[in-house]
């Protein structure tokens, strides 16, 4: 869905711009609502249909272009697509002391997000406990993401649907 390398990326973007300027039937799928999407709704041209709800309910056969505002990966099949990825995900990370290999753990975290259809670009911040501040995995994640640190007291106040017995032991 996104090529991040030079000529191919610009060729894809030029194709998307060309399709939009030609006013081909376009689906605008909004999975996040904010000031930016409100503006898109207010200024939507006639060749664009706005969709909400479940992406699987959008009949892609009606469109030659899809624009998505979403933190999720969606398969647009052969329909050209432009993804706007808002930073809306808050990811909590806990790990063993000096966990490694660092690269493998970071790849596992990102892979788990992708396998759950979340785009890593949608991460607003990663949260962890203060004691993990100097862990190599956290330092590596800090290169790409904002990290928020919390005290054990602060974390006790947060309701978690599936609490970890290991984490609760340290709280």
Model regions and ranges:
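Long, charge-dense
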Residues: 1-2, 137-171
């Amino acid at each position: 869905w996104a090529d991040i390398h030079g000529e191919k990326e610009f060729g894809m973007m030029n194709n998307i711009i060309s399709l939009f300027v030609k006013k081909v039937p376009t689906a605008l799928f909004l999975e996040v609502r904010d000031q930016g999407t409100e503006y898109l709704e207010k200024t939507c041209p006639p060749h664009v249909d706005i969709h909400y709800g479940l992406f699987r309910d959008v009949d892609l056969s009606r469109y030659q272009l899809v624009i998505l505002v979403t933190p999720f990966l969606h398969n647009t099949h052969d329909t050209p697509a432009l993804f706007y990825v808002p930073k809306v995900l808050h990811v909590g990370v806990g790990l063993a002391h000096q966990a490694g290999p660092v690269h493998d753990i970071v790849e596992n975290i990102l892979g788990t997000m992708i396998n759950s259809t979340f785009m890593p670009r949608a991460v607003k911040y990663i949260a962890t406990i203060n004691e993990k501040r100097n862990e190599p995995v956290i330092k590596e994640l800090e290169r790409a993401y904002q990290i928020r640190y919390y005290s054990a007291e602060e974390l006790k106040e947060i309701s978690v649907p599936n609490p970890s017995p290991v984490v609760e032991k340290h709280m």
